[in-house]
Amino acid sequence: MRVSSLTAPRWLLLLALSAAASAARAEPAVDPCGTFNSDVRHERALFAGQAQPLAAAKAAAGAPAVTPEHLYQLQLHQRAEVTFALPPAQRHPPPAAGYAGLVTLEVDAAGLYRVALDQAFWIDVVAKGVSIQSSDFEGRRGCAAPHKIVEFMLPANTPLTLQFSGGITPTLTLAVTRAPAAAAHH
């Protein structure tokens, strides 16, 4: 259609619609990592750093230790090769073809801690043969720094096993952090 064949109101309408469409495309997209309900600035800062490579274990015995405030890139195993300390408490059983692995953790002070991951994996924390229930969790599609954060009340000076299962990739980025004081009171 030629512009000269359009009446002035139609031409102006077409111009306005075109400008609106261009403006809509130019608006910055919402950062999915910025939409967590909790303050996750600390975890985001950790995820911006260099991850330490670490091979997760196939069983709790001999599982490598992780420490809070560090970023790890875990190398996982086929789920069928992993023997869990306890069966994963996932409501929907993960596919047998997925990936899994175990690490250990011990914290000096009891309190609320966050386990942050770069993708969707199920997390179990086991202490003395008993599963510690999570107290809260959040996840954001489109955000890998971090994608998922699960909070647990952890006991001090107690060997803990962190079990990861249900993922579809052979690697997983992990950080454990102390939850901010405000999060500990909700």
PLM features: residue spans?
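N-terminal signal peptide c-region/cleavage motif recognized by signal peptidases
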Residues: A20-A24
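Bacterial N-terminal signal peptides that target proteins for export
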Residues: R2-L13
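A short beta-strand element within beta-rich, extracytoplasmic domains
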Residues: V107-Q119
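Short, surface-exposed beta-strand/strand-loop-strand elements in extracellular ectodomains
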Residues: A120-D136
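Non-catalytic extracellular/lumenal accessory regions of secreted precursors
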Residues: E27-A97, A183-H186
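Edge beta-strands of jelly-roll/beta-sandwich modules across compartments, strongly enriched
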Residues: I168-P180
